[in-house]
Amino acid sequence: MGEICPRREDFDIDYILKNASLLEKVSLLAGYDFWHTAPLPRFNVPSVRVSDGPNGVRGTKFFDGVRAACLPCGTGLAATWDQSLLYDAGVLIGQDVYPTAAYIRGAQSTGVISTIKHFAANDQEHERISVNAVMSERALREVHLLPFQIAIADSAPGAVMTCYNKVNGQHLSESKEMLDGLLRREWGWKGLIMSDWFGTYSTAEALNAGLDLEMPGPTRLRGPLLELAISSRKVSRATLDERARTVLEFVQRARKAEVSAVESTRDFPEDRRLNRKLAADSIVLLKNESGLLPLNPQTLTSVALIGPNMKTAAFCGGGSASLQPYYSTSPYQGITSQLPPGVEVLYETGATSYAFIPELAASEVRTPEGQPGLGMRFYRDPPSVQERRVVEETIIQESSWQLMGFSNPELDRLFHADIEAELIAPATGPFQFGLAVYGSASLFLDDQLIIDNTTVQRGGTFFFGKGTLEETATVDLVQGQSYQIKVQFASGPSSKLVKPGVVNFGGGAGRLGMVQVVDPERAIARAVEAAKRADITILGVGLTRDHESEGFDRSHMDLPPAVASLVTAVLDVAPDAILLTQSGTPFSMLPWADLVKTHLHAWFGGNELGNGIADVLFGVVNPSGKLPLSFPRRIEDTPTYLNFGSERGQVTYGEGIYVGYKLLRKSPTSCALSIRVRSAPVHPCCFRSNSLLTRFVPQARFVVHLLCVLRFDGRHRVRYTECSKLGRRGRSGSSPAVYRGRSNNVVNRTSHQGAQRISKGGFAAR
């Protein structure tokens, strides 16, 4: 864990504001570096360290950082509908704002300050820093501001982060109406307002609007520019003191947290148990029509584990949500660990589904010195300079590198690096190599150039949308033979791409991949044969962090074509196959949505993904998750379909208040708990009253959840019971969540307009 930072003596904010120089006050209002605020040593004001933390705390390094615990993605956590569990987890995101507030309370109970983001209407990556989101005042307040308002009221987070985009014509980071007016005066917000990274676009305007802290540092738009704005009276001394006071109050609050002075891996048994519970409790049982689940492993003689996600530990999404876990478990690992000895396991990939060619693992390569991984050496000079000096060197365990925040005092913005390794071919046949880069890079195999991503570059989605397409080459390898791999890389300023509207995080990035080429038809045929032979077939498909990531929007809702063909082919020969899907967001389930009989959705489940899946499959844990969002049958059925994407710098929110499933919903009865739709999604959000939800618990004891809504003298009483298939009453371990709200009104209302959550204490009749 590292040594705990010693507590500093407290500091007097009024004394500092009275005695600090103009330069010292100005320095407080921008970051010191990529992950720290600026200290004031003369007044005993420390620096505050920040980090991304939507599903785990990465620390202060994207590159060569400390490995961390990874929790399930936000939509997965929202699917638990369990505030006490989220409080324990300290995990942030979810469409249901009440669990979000529970996370904030849990995280801040340790002294850590939570920052909620992105305020507000940050709903697309296309032209992220320039797009103008145009919407009605009602839609803005009832849909896009309401989650922030509730989270602030319920949990008092320590900071709010502004979004990159504009809303109704003005960037949020310089909107006095939204920051000083609505957030501070109307809502009574007392905490810090900080920019997203490189999301400050002005000096005086942003400061006067209420933006306290520009991140990251070193400053671009404060410092000398702010001194000039004060000298020219575009910013008053009173405003400067007001912003400095807020930053000092933020630091004073943060200094109470007892955190490690040195970043190191935390891996405790209790953390693993909590992570496993989170993974299992987030899983949603979408179908169990034939009553196949739970499986009894003692009765199985053979199991077919099929699909591209089966041996892939899809534990998190991409972008700011990505981190390197200290361990991970794939569905294959979790399932096979709970099978008794002697059960035959038939594994087939069946199809490829990657968005980028899979990275090289440390076990597949070794450095020139013979250690696992790839050697990386940094230089000031390009390869053309003879006897250039190595400035820094390290060993990386994955064949990707993201260098924003990376610094070395001897390197300028433009620097160079060589990535080298020895590869022992795992098989004989054609292998495809891939290379994507922000900056420039070339790949050599045994000193022969096979990929040139330097001379000519094509724009792609890599590295938050700033990088190139993945350029590829196919090479025949011989099993057991040694090959020398070398990538010559130059940092971000060497890029030939010009991409307006995209955040420039600096540094540079690269990704090297390798995969054996397979015949798609043959791969499906092998999977079909395995499904025919096995007692039980479990089919694992879905998306990964390469499909769902910060920096770009998905252009469609489809799974890769080969995956859809695989699902259909397997269901043709094994109609009782268990379908296991993974994603953080909806995807198209046609044409097989109505064919599958048993379906579990597992999200991106964190470190314990595979074990959580196995616990549900084998009845160790009740699948109590409920969808926090809807899976539409097709993208054309979504309310935003006609309006999505920036056109001439603007996106119109034509759906108004009818976001998500709300457009499809009617409320003909007096109770808003009933969900009825015009064009039913494949799987609607939440659950219905007047219907039965089947769940299972260990020893195949099935549980039926009965929800009754009774009306007495104008008031509603909710009665919730659970009974086993054999008529026994008891607890299944699930966490019920019920909402109430108006359904019919003269004024058009969404289902959650004015909705109130009925607390768990309301189920005393259970």
Swiss-Prot record:
Residues 742-756 have a biased composition (Polar residues). GO terms for molecular function: beta-glucosidase activity. Residues 369-528 form the PA14 domain. Gene3D superfamilies: Galactose-binding domain-like, Glycoside hydrolase family 3 C-terminal domain, Glycoside hydrolase, family 3, N-terminal domain. Its EC number is 3.2.1.21. Pathway: Glycan metabolism; cellulose degradation. Residues 726-766 are annotated as: Disordered. Glycans are attached at residues 19, 288, 453, 748. It catalyses: Hydrolysis of terminal, non-reducing beta-D-glucosyl residues with release of beta-D-glucose. Keywords: Carbohydrate metabolism, Cellulose degradation, Glycoprotein, Glycosidase, Hydrolase, Polysaccharide degradation, Secreted. The active site is at 196. GO terms for cellular component: extracellular region. Coiled coil: none annotated. GO terms for biological process: cellulose catabolic process. Beta-glucosidases are one of a number of cellulolytic enzymes involved in the degradation of cellulosic biomass. Catalyzes the last step releasing glucose from the inhibitory cellobiose. This is Probable beta-glucosidase K. It comes from Aspergillus fumigatus (strain CBS 144.89 / FGSC A1163 / CEA10) (Neosartorya fumigata). The lineage of its organism: Eukaryota, Fungi, Dikarya, Ascomycota, Pezizomycotina. The gene is bglK.
